[in-house]
């Protein structure tokens, strides 16, 4: 039986009220333990016969796995959503206080991505209560650390016997994502020579050299990335994130560091971006005596490109068309999701979600009516794919 609006609000409210900030981003973040236990308790109380397992990927960092077994002989479909959130320093008083205004529900993680976990939970309950006889298994995986370095989905991707996956992230409900960008977090470092501020003939200013690198990186963004966008994923992501350098006012800085996020399109690798940065170093060294630069990769995530997904896509398109009254828009994203990790493990994967907004910002919101459509789409897809 599909959930009512009041049941949806009750479930999402309870999940929003649980602090599950990823400690990878915020060192004293609460982590995912309490929300994973809440999901396990909710499913146990629902008495639907699901096999429930809490798997600690790292101490205090669990994945919650719930399997509704079919009659046998069918595939296993995994619904993947994440339990962790970013921090809420910008709205400490209201982030964990769910609020309803018409069709919109507000709160940290209500869209990104506790809505995905809740959708999986409600679909498990609905399928069990409907008495539908499915040959295959539905596995709902509420994973840790997507907002960090995705240790949860990296662990899940090694889980045996998953034949296809639907990753849920907030997005327009009529979007069916079949590819998206990868990204890298990179430190761009320039090295100078420390010297007394009154001895320019002895010092080499690492900050001045880094400023030249920044200028040329933005030129690369304007003249290459912006002018040559991907038809599916938009322009390649680039932005500066952090900058540091120097020791005091009176000394030439011997080191300066720029932290950037930079994207890759399907068919590209982060090594392509590193080569572009190193080419900038070569150009600068031709005119700046003493210039020395290096690149240090902090995190490298490959792009996502769905493969072997035709049967799953057929089921999703049929369900989305039925629920929405029109075919979905098959497209890409300029963001990154755990779909890339599932597909990289050889699991045919697609990405859907429900309308929301203000992700990683105050007053994050979710459309309740669109969320309920997502639940129906998931249930119909599971019935079709697993039968």
Where are these regions (language model features)?
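Glycine/serine-rich anion-binding loops at beta->alpha junctions
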Residues: 103-119, 196
């Amino acid at each position: 039986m599909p959930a009512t609006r009041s049941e949806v609000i009750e479930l999402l409210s309870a999940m929003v009220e649980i602090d599950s900030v990823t400690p990878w981003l915020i060192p004293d973040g609460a982590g995912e333990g309490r929300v994973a236990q809440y999901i396990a308790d909710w499913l146990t109380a629902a008495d639907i016969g699901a096999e429930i397992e809490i798997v600690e990927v790292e101490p205090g960092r669990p994945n919650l796995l719930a399997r509704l077994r079919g009659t046998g002989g069918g595939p296993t479909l995994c619904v993947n959503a994440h339990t962790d959130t970013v921090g809420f320093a910008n709205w400490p008083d209201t982030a964990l206080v769910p609020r309803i205004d018409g069709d919109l529900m507000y709160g940290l993680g209500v869209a990104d991505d506790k809505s995905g976990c809740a959708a999986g939970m409600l679909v498990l309950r609905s399928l069990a209560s409907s008495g539908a006889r499915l040959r295959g298994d539905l596995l709902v995986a509420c994973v840790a650390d997507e907002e960090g370095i995705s240790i949860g989905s990296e662990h899940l991707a090694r889980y045996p016997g998953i034949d296809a996956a639907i990753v849920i992230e907030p997005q327009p409900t009529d979007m069916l994502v079949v590819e998206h960008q990868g990204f890298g977090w990179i430190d761009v470092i320039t090295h100078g020579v420390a010297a007394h501020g009154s001895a320019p003939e002895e010092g080499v200013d690492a900050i001045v050299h880094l400023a030249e690198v920044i200028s040329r990186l933005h030129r690369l963004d304007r003249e290459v990335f912006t002018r040559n966008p991907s038809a599916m994923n938009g322009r390649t992501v680039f932005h500066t994130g952090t900058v540091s350098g120097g020791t005091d006012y009176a000394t030439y800085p011997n080191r300066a560091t720029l932290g950037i996020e930079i994207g890759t399109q399907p068919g590209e690798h982060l090594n392509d971006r590193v080569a572009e940065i190193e080419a900038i170093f070569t150009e600068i060294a031709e005119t700046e005596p003493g210039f020395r630069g290096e690149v240090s990769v902090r995190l490298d995530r490959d792009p996502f490109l769905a493969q072997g997904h035709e049967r799953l896509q057929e089921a999703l398109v049929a369900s989305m068309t039925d629920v929405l009254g029109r075919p979905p828009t098959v497209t890409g994203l300029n963001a990154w999701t755990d779909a890339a990790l599932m597909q990289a493990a050889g699991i045919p994967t697609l990405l859907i979600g429900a309308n929301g907004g203000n992700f990683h910002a105050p007053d994050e919101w979710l459309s309740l009516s669109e969320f309920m459509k997502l639940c129906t789409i998931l249930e119909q897809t599971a019935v079709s794919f697993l039968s």
